[in-house]
Each structure stands twice: as structure tokens, then as C-alpha cells.
Amino acid sequence: MQSESLFIEKENYTLHLKRFYTKEKAPSVFLVHGSIEDGKIFYSKSGKGFAPFLAENGFDVFVADLRGRGKSKPHPSRDNNFGMASAFEEDIPDFIAKIKSIKGKEPDHWVSHSWGGVHLMAYLAKNEAPNLKSMVFFGSKRDIRVKNLKKFLIVDLLWFGYCTFLAKTKGYLPARQYKIGSADEAKDYFLEVNKWVRSRDWKDLRDGFDYAAALQQKTLPPILSITGANDKQIGHPVDCRRLLKEIGDQDNFTFKVIGKQQGYQHDYDHINLLTHKDAKDDHFREVLEWLKD
């Protein structure tokens, strides 16, 4: 298996795209991470993870570092602020264009973790993707309505409370310094994500464009949405299932909970759904077969 780092030079920033492949003419997969993380949710320094797994099994894999995350520079700071729409109006189109310049066409499959699914769907609401064959969500939700102690502590107190205070006072969210996440977030990006997470309506914060209504009018590709049985707050099954309903609940959508009760090896949570050492011999195999079909 080969890997390489590709860079997209913009006027005031650089985007990083990590590629894993065993053969260049393989079908392509585009992977997008979520909030307070970077593309390494899909791979490790030692070459393990979902992205290398796909490459070893016949796919040409491209992993995004959205603006300011991972090797995309500069990182967020008081002087480097940007909003959430930068991800789906600028970064994702740039990544897709880069993949097209290499492959000759747009990526065949799109995969997301957590909030990355919202970015991809927001992009699709306003753009066509005629070459797109399928999508996979790992723990992707758009809003959080579940009520339990973990949600109260992690989402309400930590995210909406303490992290909002940090972002406003420091000018960005220093998630790495405070061990809240693996990547820092720009202030406006973080605050705007929170507004969508708390809102019943999926509307643009600038002009009121209704993303859900737009997506419901489209014929979307097959979507496989999975989440961990032990994901109690960030990607709770109830909230992840509701995202599929919000975008039209088409017949070609499939939703699965990954846990012992469903026949899997572990009750996975929001992170180890992608990072657990047993995942490649558990649900990764199922996702692989789904992509190949």
C-alpha cells in the first residue's frame, strides 16, 4: 500500500488531502472528518484505520483535513477565524476538484464521521454529484435531542457551556490544549455548529436556505448510516436515525446500530467505532461489502 500527502494552495491557507492506495485505477472514496478532529480519525501513523483498510481492499482513498485541521494550515487562532460554511462551500468543492484532477472524475463514494456527514449533505443540497454511487455515515447526526446524563455533561455543560466560554474569550476553541478534542476549532465555526446542533430547523444561518427541504427534493444515492450502541451523546442512535428522516428517508437508506445485541464484538462508542483494533474484522467488513455492492 502507498500513501502520500497532497496539498491545495489557496490565497491565505493550505488544504491537506491524505491518499492511500494499492492501485491507481481503483474506485475512489472521499473521507471527511467531524468537529474538533482531523482526518486522522480515519488512519493512524502506523497505517491502521478505516482509510488504510479500504485501500488494502481495492479502493483509492482520499482523506480530507478540513481548513485549519491536521496538516491544513494555518490552524485556528484569534487571528485566523472562519465560519462553518467554509467547509461545505469552499473546502469540500476544492477537495473534490483535486480528486477529479487525479482520477479524471469526482469520487465514487463519500464517507463521513460525525459532523462530516452534515458538511457533505449541506454540499449536496446545493450541488449535483452525478458520479456519486453511495455514502456512509459513521455516527453522523445533525441535531442532538436525546436526553441522558452523558448528554447533559458532555453536550450541555462542556460543549454549550465551557467550550463556548473558551471560544469567546480566547478567540478560538483550543480543544487540544484542554484535551477536549484532537483539533482546535475557529470561533465562528464552533459557535455556528452549536447553533445547528440546537436547532430543530436545518436552515442557513445567513439567508435562511432550507437544507432539509432541498435534500428531500433530490434523489440521493444509497446511504449506509451506522453508529455505536455505546454512543450515548454525540451520535446517539435516535439522533443519527433522525438525520436520515430529515433528508427524506428514501428506500435506499440503511441504518444500523453496532453493538453486542446486534451481533457485533463490542458496544462501540463515537470514537472507537472507527479506531477500535477489532473494527476491521467486525463492522468494517460489512461496510466494505456494502461499498462494493
Predicted regions and their residues:
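Catalytic active-site module of serine/aspartate enzymes centered on a nucleophile-bearing elbow/loop
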Residues: 251-293
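Short beta-strand/loop motif that positions the catalytic acidic residue
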Residues: 225-227
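Alpha/beta-hydrolase-fold enzymes
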Residues: 101, 105, 111, 115-206
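Conserved alpha/beta-hydrolase "acid-adjacent" motif
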Residues: 232-239
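Short, surface-exposed "cap/lid" segments of acyl-processing enzymes
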Residues: 22-75
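N-terminal cap/lid segment of alpha/beta-hydrolase-fold proteins
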Residues: 1-22
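Acidic beta-to-alpha connecting loop that harbors the catalytic carboxylate
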Residues: 229-232, 271
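Alpha/beta-hydrolase active-site loop
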Residues: 81-100
